[in-house]
Regions:
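Trp/Phe/Arg-rich N-terminal binding region typifying the photolyase-homology
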Residues: 1-154
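Glycine/tryptophan-enriched, flexible segments
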Residues: 115, 134-190
Length: 190
């Protein structure tokens, strides 16, 4: 999971489900991104509480988002040591330079390990383009693409014991979500 924390109209989750192999749903709180000046506690709280709300939906199908705290490279190296990872499905990141550099590093690692990483576009941002030629046409294609209706099979997701737990102090801060903030979760979207 990257920025889109919904159970519906989620193309990467749809592809994972249709791949007909067991899969994990992972969200990584990355220290480098957390420490970046663009990141606020309020944003992190919204993400964390959106994951809690998403898990309420996924739990009905015995699935959940497994939360990790660590750099993506280390988390994926751990996962590849624990499992035979064949595919990774995610949305294309549209964030800051650090996330761009991270994704290039992860892409190279996946290529070396023979892992197919399919990134889906979720908005009008196209990473790495040299110019805006054809941008309008591509934007319209994405905006006109059909809505994805996710359907999840009941499948007991592996509860993985991993060393990437949220630090207790951070977890406490994330759980302390002020009532006056917009409620988290896809059913509370404005």
């Amino acid at each position: 999971m990257k920025r889109d924390l919904r159970s519906q109209n989620h193309e990467p989750l749809n592809c994972a489900e249709k791949s007909d192999i067991p899969y994990l749903i992972v969200y990584i709180f990355e220290p480098k991104l957390i420490q970046h000046h663009d990141t606020s506690l309020r944003h992190l709280q919204f993400i964390y509480n959106s994951i809690i709300e998403l898990n309420k939906i996924l739990n009905k199908k015995e699935r959940f988002v497994d939360v990790f705290y660590g750099e993506a490279k280390n988390v994926f190296q751990f996962l590849m040591n624990e499992f035979e990872v064949k595919n990774v499905f995610s949305y294309q990141e549209s964030g800051i330079q650090i996330s761009w550099e991270r994704d290039r590093l992860i892409s190279k690692m996946f290529q070396r390990k023979g892992v197919s990483w399919k990134e889906f576009q979720r908005d009008g941002i196209i990473r790495g383009i040299k110019n805006r030629d054809q941008w309008r046409k591509k934007w319209h294609q994405i905006m006109r693409s059909p809505i994805v209706f996710n359907d999840y099979s009941v499948s007991k997701q592996v509860e993985l014991n991993h060393p990437f737990k949220l630090p207790a102090e951070l977890k406490t801060k994330l759980e302390d979500y002020p009532m006056e903030y917009q409620p988290a979760g896809e059913f509370n979207a404005w």
